[in-house]
Amino acid sequence: MPGLGRRAQWLCWWWGLLCSCCGPPPLRPPLPAAAAAAAGGQLLGDGGSPGRTEQPPPSPQSSSGFLYRRLKTQEKREMQKEILSVLGLPHRPRPLHGLQQPQPPALRQQEEQQQQQQLPRGEPPPGRLKSAPLFMLDLYNALSADNDEDGASEGERQQSWPHEAASSSQRRQPPPGAAHPLNRKSLLAPGSGSGGASPLTSAQDSAFLNDADMVMSFVNLVEYDKEFSPRQRHHKEFKFNLSQIPEGEVVTAAEFRIYKDCVMGSFKNQTFLISIYQVLQEHQHRDSDLFLLDTRVVWASEEGWLEFDITATSNLWVVTPQHNMGLQLSVVTRDGVHVHPRAAGLVGRDGPYDKQPFMVAFFKVSEVHVRTTRSASSRRRQQSRNRSTQSQDVARVSSASDYNSSELKTACRKHELYVSFQDLGWQDWIIAPKGYAANYCDGECSFPLNAHMNATNHAIVQTLVHLMNPEYVPKPCCAPTKLNAISVLYFDDNSNVILKKYRNMVVRACGCH
């Protein structure tokens, strides 16, 4: 008789509860699955510590193995403000050209064909990225690969952007006739075809990336060609806005990047000298004053991304924005003849969207970022409203937690906690990741402190003193002992792409402190 056995089990539990004065009560029999679901779950957690309950969620949902409840509008707004403060952003970016939700392949291909005739030249279809975001995505994937090599678990690895694959070599192939995805930055060897090395093959770029706290790409702001004098009629102008750099960031390296196609026809055997100049001063009736920044000598048959060092002028533009008058590019053949950049295979703003010229700068913070202190009055009001409804639940919990039973408490350990940028409604400006496993520490630091608790010597001494004077000395606290950084790739208000490292964002290990 299964019903009689279940009834006897509950009677034994109640008898133990009545006799609790003689010792701790036995564990309550497990609830059925339906009853457990009705009891509710923890927000974005893995169940936490036994004996600790949460307020039943109004509408629990499950995503990626996490049980959570739908946030109210005010709660969501408060959480957005707090996370933006952690990210060092004064407000939510609203880029002009943000991201759109991915669509099924058949529908996406149909819409792309319909919109291809309406898009301005050089503009990508919805859901696709230009050359600068693609390059930044390669940098992000390189950082994510480094994090994986450091031993991060599967639950802690950041999720790549769904619109593009995890790496350049795995990115889906474009339709015939379309531009190839960005998969290299250096010039390819003559006759090497469309294959090539990864954008991070050079040791210099790897050093820049490892040393930087933030990487930022800038789009070319020039929309129309400027008329130059006959001597400079083939010059091309580029301008970038560096006025929105966060305070405390110093430029460690900066590059101007422009794509070169293979040259055929009358210039197929030619060698070109490509020069990049800083515009020092503009004049109405004569040529502008120029300062040579960098040069490259290339063959007509070479193809790939050209890089020019503009670190010096970038630092000047950040410190004194009024001196930012842009760059000029010139192309000269080995015979000393000035030619149009298009004749040398250089792709301008009218070229394919994934071959647009852009600028990238590496930054390192010169001072520690301090979060802005904001008023918590709204949270206090919300807490005061909930305090009366939670007081009875807290009383019931405390009555059970008063028992010093090892079965009712768990040792200090790491628990799962996932932060979803998509659930916060930020999928239009955060390129990657969709979210990350932040995790948290919780549990008891009771005597004896085992080796797996990662206790400090001070925590061991504090535990011993707590045993002698529990009213005056508290137990050690369960806190993170190892924290990892994450990288976030996002658009700013000017549609520039920023790759930023945020330290101490992921809990890797916990211990008693």
UniProtKB/Swiss-Prot annotation:
Domain of life: Eukaryota
Any one GO MF annotation of this record: protein heterodimerization activity
GO BP of this protein: BMP signaling pathway; bone development; cartilage development; cellular response to BMP stimulus; cellular response to iron ion; cellular response to mechanical stimulus; endochondral ossification; eye development
Subcellular location(s) of the protein: Secreted
GO cellular component, one term: vesicle
Biased composition annotated in UniProt, kind: Low complexity: 98-121
Keywords linked to the UniProt accession: Chondrogenesis, Cleavage on pair of basic residues, Cytokine, Developmental protein, Differentiation, Disease variant, Disulfide bond, Glycoprotein, Growth factor, Osteogenesis, Secreted, Signal
SMART domains recorded: TGFB
Disordered as annotated region, ranges: 38-66, 89-131, 145-200, 373-398
Biased composition (Polar residues): 158-172
Removed propeptide positions: 21-374
Maturation and modification: Glycosylated at Asn-454. Glycosylation is crucial for recognition by the activin receptor type I/ACVR1.
Residues linked to a glycan: 241, 269, 386, 404, 454
Keyword Signal: yes
Effect on the protein of changing residue 95 to S: In IO; associated with disease susceptibility; some patients also carry a HFE variant; decreased function in positive regulation of SMAD protein signal transduction; results in partial activation of hepcidin expression; affects post-translational processing resulting in reduced amount of the mature form; results in impaired secretion
Signal sequence annotation: 1-20
Entry keyword annotation includes Cell membrane: no
UniProt xrefs under PROSITE patterns: TGF_BETA_1, TGF_BETA_2
Cystine residue pairs: 412-478, 441-510, 445-512
Disease listed for this protein: Iron overload: A disorder of iron homeostasis with incomplete and age-dependent penetrance. It is characterized by adult onset of increased hepatic and systemic iron levels, increased serum ferritin, normal or high transferrin saturation, and inappropriately low or normal levels of hepcidin. The severity of the phenotype depends on age, sex, as well as additional genetic or acquired factors including alcohol consumption and increased body weight.
Function: Growth factor of the TGF-beta superfamily that plays essential roles in many developmental processes including cartilage and bone formation. Also plays an important role in the regulation of HAMP/hepcidin expression and iron metabolism by acting as a ligand for hemojuvelin/HJV. Also acts to promote expression of HAMP, potentially via the interaction with its receptor BMPR1A/ALK3. Initiates the canonical BMP signaling cascade by associating with type I receptor ACVR1 and type II receptor ACVR2B.
Family, per entry: Belongs to the TGF-beta family.
Record text on subunit structure and interactions: Interacts with SOSTDC1. Interacts (when glycosylated) with type I receptor ACVR1; the interaction may induce HAMP expression. Interacts with type II receptor ACVR2B. Interacts with Hemojuvelin/HJV. Interacts with ERFE; the interaction inhibits BMP-induced transcription of HAMP. Interacts with BMPR1A/ALK3. Forms heterodimers with BMP2 in vitro; the heterodimer then binds to its receptor BMPR1A /ALK3 and may induce HAMP expression.
Protein known as: Bone morphogenetic protein 6
